[in-house]
Design a protein with these regions (language model features):
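Active-site region of glycoside hydrolase catalytic domains
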Residues: 1-43, 86-88, 96-357, 361-389
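A common structural microfeature
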Residues: 7-9, 56, 73
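Aromatic- and Gly/Pro-rich amphipathic surface segment
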Residues: 30-64
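Generic alpha-helix structural propensity
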Residues: 54-61, 69, 78, 94-101, ...
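Catalytic domains of carbohydrate-active enzymes, especially glycoside hydrolases
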Residues: 58-79, 293-299
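Glycine-rich, proline-tolerant flexible connector loops at the mouths of alpha/beta enzymes
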Residues: 78-91
Length: 392
């Protein structure tokens, strides 16, 4: 039986745009996702987050559900545009009031709030000035962070600055699948990336200056590989591909965030392709100097799956999965090994406390005649993955 240590923190995580709704209520400004989702052809069937899970009105019910599950932590993101509608210092008291209610009620329930300051929903007003291509956005983020830290001082001590820069940059500014829907070359994408790293460093300084008890975290996602066998050569091969940053697949790596923030240096040419290496070589010195301010106290890892790897005759190579392998409704492979090997490799390289900040699966959920969702697939998935997590 899988046994977890007493200090293991069981919790749940959400994102503002994905659950809150209340898109135009109580002074909230427009985010890039508000604009993107209302642009014809951008989302499936024109879906938007205008209502979403309606957590803006039903947050008390959400907390009751958390209590019923005996969870001790809740990671939620704050909608920047609910706090500052245009991303400046136009503070919205009704926005603060909403999060005050949420935080205070969580604390009363014995559930510790973990705040994510940015989960993809940039104020549209800042995007119109260049968004993450513009270094001023990093400074605006630091101002927003300072205000949040001061407002919640003494109540919130667990902070994550960013969630998944890989999705923010690659899917928002590279492929255009996510807001703001741009398709920039690698150089333009990397400019966004370095500005997000810079923003984290400035924000970390604000959080620590406001309250020495604050813990600063960063949530990363990226490629995880696991060895096709226990042979040392395969273990080394999987490690190598986990941290590699080739030009054609550089963003979805933990390396691109965690090397600069945890090690104080960008990944070198031994890991990076030539185009990426050239971008790294052009990072302004003041951003490199700021990296020492941004070392996290904790890491959030979003891990859903992994890829099997072995040492081939010409170096590390991917192994084809067997026919009929299990997958989710989104066609993501079900790979419990990801929660075993992923945290191992990350811990070896960075040596910081870790949270599995996201994990789960998509299902084709059905409500049966008894009014319930008999969640067999999800129960099976979580059982498999928790065993892998317990082994770590």
């Amino acid at each position: 039986m899988a046994v977890f240590p007493k200090e293991f923190v069981w919790g749940a995580a959400t994102a503002a745009y994905q659950i809150e709704g209340g898109a135009v209520e109580d002074g909230k400004g427009r985010s890039i996702w508000d604009v993107f989702s209302h642009t014809p052809g951008r989302t499936y069937r024109g879906e938007t987050g205008d209502t979403a899970c309606d957590s803006y009105h039903r947050w008390r019910e959400d907390i009751e559900l958390l209590k019923s599950m005996h969870l001790k932590a809740y990671r939620f993101s704050v909608a920047w545009t609910r706090i500052a509608p245009t991303g400046g210092t136009d503070w919205n008291e009704k926005g603060f009031a909403y999060y005050d209610g949420l935080v205070n009620t969580l604390l009363e329930a014995g559930i510790e709030p973990y705040i994510t300051l940015y989960h993809w929903d940039l104020p549209q007003a800042l995007e119109e000035k260049g968004g993450w291509q513009n270094e001023d956005t990093a400074r605006a983020f630091a101002v927003y962070t300072a205000k949040m830290a001061e407002h919640f001082k003494g109540r919130v001590h667990q902070w994550f600055t960013f969630n998944e820069p890989a999705c923010i940059v690659k899917m928002g500014y590279g492929t255009g699948e996510h807001a703001p829907g741009l398709k920039l070359p690698l150089e333009g994408q990397f400019t966004c990336w370095q500005n997000i790293i810079y923003a984290h460093c400035l924000a970390a300084q604000e959080l620590r200056h406001t309250d020495a008890e604050n813990r600063v975290g960063f949530v990363s996602t990226g490629r995880i590989c696991y060895p096709a066998s226990e042979a040392k050569a395969d273990v080394d091969a999987a490690r190598a591909l986990t941290f590699a940053c080739p030009d054609e697949d550089w963003a979805f790596t933990h390396t691109m965030s965690l090397d600069p923030l945890c090690l104080g240096r960008w990944p070198g040419p031994d890991l990076c392709g030539p185009q990426l290496s050239a971008c790294i070589g052009a990072v302004p010195q003041y951003i490199n100097d700021a990296l020492s301010l941004g070392r996290p106290d904790m890491l959030g890892l979003n891990i859903y799956n992994a890829a099997p790897v072995q040492m081939g005759t010409n170096g590390p190579c991917y192994v084809e999965r067997p026919a009929g392998y299990a997958h989710t409704a989104m066609n993501w492979p079900v790979e419990p090994e990801s929660l075993n090997w992923g945290p191992r490799y990350i811990q070896e390289r960075y040596g910081l406390p870790m949270f599995i900040a996201e994990n789960g699966l998509s299902c084709t959920d059905k409500i049966y005649r008894d009014g319930k969702v008999h969640d067999v697939e999800r129960i099976d998935f979580l059982a498999r993955y928790q065993i892998g997590r317990a082994h770590v």
